[in-house]
């Protein structure tokens, strides 16, 4: 069996064109473009690279971008004050708190300080709760990107058994909610799951998001399964692989996302889509 390649780069290009047009229409109506701000405490090479990629994405669709950098020694009160200032600024529509934070800072406290209407990472408890209840919410970008790929390739989820490997608030949990909303039967696996391979083999849809290179192999998959690989693992200088062993899994799956080039390129487009959604919502309330 030769698996269908779920091409994230192609979808990202399509989404970029759509968002760019919608952003231009928004600016024509309101007189301003959606504005995104990233709040970063200190930083490292990986964090700085990601911030630059967000800047390029914003510039590519005509959105405004700003970076607010705080010293590495910042305390919780300083961080939350910066977040609250951006939350209260009517010229800012989307806010990202760049993770990870230094050890003296609470990520939960920082996220809670956000205006949930500007929480374009979809991590605020209000957005998580609204998603769980099936209400309109800003959804975390990575799982939203995975769902967009399934939609792009018209993969039906109703009545299918979806196995999600990973239970983070960023990917695993929200992805399970999104799949459930599309009438899939969902199983979430994690580090304490007994007989992991047996559970994965039950999945018509398998999503891996644990940060362990090659954890899911072809032997674990039901023949014909659809595989979403959210893993990004650097195993050698310049070599990135996913949580799924591509060589074996691509021979068993009916469709699979590559790494790189699968879910990753769509993630930034979902961030832009959330920023546009937030700007539109705030404009309606003004």
From Swiss-Prot:
Record keywords: Amino-acid biosynthesis, Histidine biosynthesis, Hydrolase, Methionine biosynthesis, Multifunctional enzyme, NADP, One-carbon metabolism, Oxidoreductase, Purine biosynthesis
Cellular compartments per GO CC: cytosol
SUPFAM superfamilies according to UniProt: Aminoacid dehydrogenase-like, N-terminal domain (SSF53223), NAD(P)-binding Rossmann-fold domains (SSF51735)
Recorded metabolic or biological pathway in which this protein acts: One-carbon metabolism; tetrahydrofolate interconversion
InterPro entries per record: Aminoacid_DH-like_N_sf, NAD(P)-bd_dom_sf, THF_DH/CycHdrlase, THF_DH/CycHdrlase_cat_dom, THF_DH/CycHdrlase_NAD-bd_dom
Molecular functions per Gene Ontology: methenyltetrahydrofolate cyclohydrolase activity; methylenetetrahydrofolate dehydrogenase (NADP+) activity
Keyword Membrane attributed: no
Binding-site list for NADP(+): 166-168, 191, 232
CDD domains listed in its UniProt record: NAD_bind_m-THF_DH_Cyclohyd (cd01080)
Catalytic activity annotation: (6R)-5,10-methylene-5,6,7,8-tetrahydrofolate + NADP(+) = (6R)-5,10-methenyltetrahydrofolate + NADPH; (6R)-5,10-methenyltetrahydrofolate + H2O = (6R)-10-formyltetrahydrofolate + H(+)
EC number(s) stated in the UniProt entry for this protein: 1.5.1.5, 3.5.4.9
Gene3D superfamilies reported in the protein's UniProt record: Leucine Dehydrogenase, chain A, domain 1, NAD(P)-binding Rossmann-like Domain
HAMAP family in the cross-refs: THF_DHG_CYH (MF_01576)
Description of how the protein assembles with itself and partners: Homodimer.
Entry's family note: Belongs to the tetrahydrofolate dehydrogenase/cyclohydrolase family.
Protein name: Bifunctional protein FolD
Gene name linked to the record: folD
